[in-house]
Amino acid sequence: MATNHVLASQLPVNTKSSEIPLQSGTPPPTIIYPFQIEMASLGTADASDSISIASNSLLASVTTLYRHAKLTSLKATIHPTGQAPAFPTTVALAWVPYNSTATSAQILSVYGGQMFCIGGSINSLSPIDVPCNLTNVNPIIKDSVTYSDTPKLLLYSIAQETAPTLATCSVTITGTLTLHSPLLQATA
Protein backbone atom coordinates (compact mmCIF):
# COMPACT_ATOMS: atom_id res chain seq x y z
CA MET A 1 0.00 0.00 0.00
CA ALA A 2 1.61 3.25 -1.13
CA THR A 3 1.25 6.23 1.16
CA ASN A 4 1.86 9.82 0.27
CA HIS A 5 4.24 11.50 2.70
CA VAL A 6 4.23 15.22 3.35
CA LEU A 7 7.79 16.59 3.35
CA ALA A 8 8.30 19.40 5.86
CA SER A 9 11.98 20.34 5.61
CA GLN A 10 13.57 22.34 8.38
CA LEU A 11 15.41 25.36 6.99
CA PRO A 12 19.21 24.94 6.77
CA VAL A 13 21.77 26.96 8.68
CA ASN A 14 25.09 27.44 6.91
CA THR A 15 27.37 25.59 9.34
CA LYS A 16 29.75 22.71 8.84
CA SER A 17 30.75 20.18 11.45
CA SER A 18 34.47 19.78 11.84
CA GLU A 19 35.71 16.53 10.43
CA ILE A 20 39.20 15.24 10.98
CA PRO A 21 40.36 13.77 7.67
CA LEU A 22 41.08 10.07 7.71
CA GLN A 23 44.65 8.96 7.30
CA SER A 24 45.84 8.59 3.73
CA GLY A 25 45.58 5.17 2.14
CA THR A 26 42.76 2.74 1.55
CA PRO A 27 39.63 3.73 3.46
CA PRO A 28 38.36 1.11 5.92
CA PRO A 29 35.48 -1.13 4.86
CA THR A 30 32.13 0.26 5.92
CA ILE A 31 28.72 -1.13 6.73
CA ILE A 32 25.60 0.87 5.92
CA TYR A 33 22.99 0.17 8.61
CA PRO A 34 19.39 1.37 8.11
CA PHE A 35 17.28 1.88 11.24
CA GLN A 36 13.81 2.95 12.34
CA ILE A 37 12.88 3.55 15.96
CA GLU A 38 9.46 4.45 17.37
CA MET A 39 10.15 7.32 19.76
CA ALA A 40 6.69 8.32 20.97
CA SER A 41 2.99 7.54 20.80
CA LEU A 42 1.09 10.81 21.10
CA GLY A 43 -2.44 12.11 21.56
CA THR A 44 -3.47 10.54 24.86
CA ALA A 45 -1.86 13.29 26.98
CA ASP A 46 0.33 16.34 26.54
CA ALA A 47 3.96 15.38 25.96
CA SER A 48 7.35 16.99 25.58
CA ASP A 49 10.73 15.40 25.09
CA SER A 50 14.29 16.06 24.04
CA ILE A 51 15.70 13.03 22.21
CA SER A 52 19.46 12.64 21.73
CA ILE A 53 20.30 10.45 18.75
CA ALA A 54 23.88 9.71 19.87
CA SER A 55 22.77 8.44 23.28
CA ASN A 56 19.76 6.42 22.09
CA SER A 57 20.08 2.95 23.63
CA LEU A 58 18.98 1.09 20.49
CA LEU A 59 21.54 2.87 18.30
CA ALA A 60 24.21 2.44 20.99
CA SER A 61 23.64 -1.33 20.87
CA VAL A 62 24.16 -1.27 17.08
CA THR A 63 27.34 0.81 17.28
CA THR A 64 28.87 -1.04 20.24
CA LEU A 65 31.10 -3.25 18.06
CA TYR A 66 32.48 -0.35 15.99
CA ARG A 67 34.83 2.53 16.76
CA HIS A 68 33.16 4.97 14.37
CA ALA A 69 29.53 5.66 13.41
CA LYS A 70 28.27 8.48 11.22
CA LEU A 71 24.71 9.35 10.24
CA THR A 72 24.25 9.57 6.48
CA SER A 73 20.51 10.31 6.65
CA LEU A 74 18.07 11.11 9.45
CA LYS A 75 14.42 12.12 9.61
CA ALA A 76 11.52 12.18 12.03
CA THR A 77 8.14 11.01 10.73
CA ILE A 78 4.74 11.65 12.27
CA HIS A 79 2.40 8.72 11.50
CA PRO A 80 -1.34 9.41 12.07
CA THR A 81 -3.47 6.53 13.38
CA GLY A 82 -7.16 5.75 12.93
CA GLN A 83 -7.89 7.89 16.02
CA ALA A 84 -6.51 11.06 14.36
CA PRO A 85 -9.66 12.18 12.44
CA ALA A 86 -11.77 12.23 15.62
CA PHE A 87 -9.05 13.56 17.95
CA PRO A 88 -6.76 16.12 16.27
CA THR A 89 -3.38 16.41 17.96
CA THR A 90 -0.87 19.26 17.77
CA VAL A 91 2.73 18.12 17.27
CA ALA A 92 5.77 20.42 17.13
CA LEU A 93 9.25 19.23 16.08
CA ALA A 94 12.70 20.78 15.63
CA TRP A 95 16.14 19.31 15.00
CA VAL A 96 18.87 21.06 17.01
CA PRO A 97 22.46 20.27 18.06
CA TYR A 98 22.65 18.38 21.36
CA ASN A 99 24.31 21.35 23.09
CA SER A 100 21.46 23.70 22.16
CA THR A 101 19.73 25.20 25.19
CA ALA A 102 16.36 25.30 23.41
CA THR A 103 13.61 23.35 25.16
CA SER A 104 10.55 21.56 23.82
CA ALA A 105 8.38 24.52 24.86
CA GLN A 106 10.49 26.82 22.63
CA ILE A 107 10.26 24.87 19.35
CA LEU A 108 8.61 27.69 17.41
CA SER A 109 11.36 30.04 18.60
CA VAL A 110 14.00 27.76 17.07
CA TYR A 111 14.99 28.56 13.47
CA GLY A 112 13.21 25.93 11.37
CA GLY A 113 10.98 24.60 14.18
CA GLN A 114 7.56 23.49 12.91
CA MET A 115 4.10 22.73 14.31
CA PHE A 116 1.53 20.42 12.73
CA CYS A 117 -2.10 19.53 13.39
CA ILE A 118 -2.41 15.78 12.99
CA GLY A 119 -5.92 14.58 12.20
CA GLY A 120 -9.24 16.35 12.20
CA SER A 121 -11.74 16.42 9.36
CA ILE A 122 -9.80 18.81 7.10
CA ASN A 123 -6.13 18.11 7.83
CA SER A 124 -4.00 15.60 5.99
CA LEU A 125 -3.74 12.11 7.37
CA SER A 126 -0.56 11.44 5.38
CA PRO A 127 2.67 10.78 7.28
CA ILE A 128 4.77 13.93 7.67
CA ASP A 129 8.55 13.67 7.21
CA VAL A 130 10.81 16.20 8.95
CA PRO A 131 14.36 15.55 7.71
CA CYS A 132 17.36 16.53 9.80
CA ASN A 133 19.76 18.72 7.84
CA LEU A 134 23.02 17.00 8.76
CA THR A 135 25.01 20.16 7.98
CA ASN A 136 23.28 21.90 10.93
CA VAL A 137 24.52 19.25 13.39
CA ASN A 138 27.48 16.90 13.72
CA PRO A 139 26.51 13.58 12.06
CA ILE A 140 29.27 11.62 13.84
CA ILE A 141 27.56 9.85 16.74
CA LYS A 142 30.48 7.61 17.74
CA ASP A 143 34.18 8.38 17.49
CA SER A 144 37.37 8.35 19.54
CA VAL A 145 36.05 11.49 21.24
CA THR A 146 32.56 12.55 22.30
CA TYR A 147 30.90 15.42 20.42
CA SER A 148 28.42 17.82 22.00
CA ASP A 149 26.72 18.91 18.77
CA THR A 150 25.17 15.65 17.55
CA PRO A 151 21.47 15.65 16.51
CA LYS A 152 18.74 16.14 19.08
CA LEU A 153 15.01 16.13 18.33
CA LEU A 154 12.79 18.47 20.30
CA LEU A 155 9.21 17.19 20.49
CA TYR A 156 6.10 18.81 21.92
CA SER A 157 2.52 17.58 21.66
CA ILE A 158 -0.81 18.90 22.88
CA ALA A 159 -3.71 16.45 23.25
CA GLN A 160 -7.44 17.20 23.23
CA GLU A 161 -9.14 18.00 26.55
CA THR A 162 -11.10 14.77 26.13
CA ALA A 163 -8.17 12.73 24.90
CA PRO A 164 -8.64 9.19 23.58
CA THR A 165 -7.17 6.15 25.31
CA LEU A 166 -5.36 5.11 22.11
CA ALA A 167 -2.63 7.14 20.40
CA THR A 168 -3.61 9.48 17.55
CA CYS A 169 -0.13 9.43 16.04
CA SER A 170 3.34 7.99 16.50
CA VAL A 171 6.73 9.58 15.90
CA THR A 172 9.53 7.51 14.43
CA ILE A 173 13.14 8.32 13.69
CA THR A 174 14.54 6.75 10.54
CA GLY A 175 17.97 6.95 9.03
CA THR A 176 21.15 5.24 7.93
CA LEU A 177 24.44 4.85 9.75
CA THR A 178 27.85 4.24 8.24
CA LEU A 179 29.85 2.01 10.59
CA HIS A 180 33.55 1.25 10.26
CA SER A 181 36.65 0.14 12.19
CA PRO A 182 35.61 -2.82 14.33
CA LEU A 183 36.29 -2.45 18.04
CA LEU A 184 38.73 -5.21 18.95
CA GLN A 185 37.42 -7.22 21.88
CA ALA A 186 37.95 -10.62 23.41
CA THR A 187 35.64 -13.32 22.06
CA ALA A 188 35.54 -15.37 25.24
Curated annotation (Swiss-Prot):
Gene Ontology cellular component annotations, sorted alphabetically: T=3 icosahedral viral capsid
Superkingdom of the source species: Viruses
Pfam families linked: Tymo_coat (PF00983)
Principal location listed in the UniProt entry: virion
Subcellular location: Virion
Keywords for the protein's UniProt record, in alphabetical order: Capsid protein, T=3 icosahedral capsid protein, Virion
A GO MF term: structural molecule activity
InterPro entries xrefs: Tymo_coat, Viral_coat
Function: Self-assembles to form a T=3 icosahedral capsid composed of 180 copies of the capsid protein. The capsid encapsulates the single-stranded RNA genome.
Family membership noted in the UniProt record: Belongs to the tymoviruses capsid protein family.
Protein name: Capsid protein
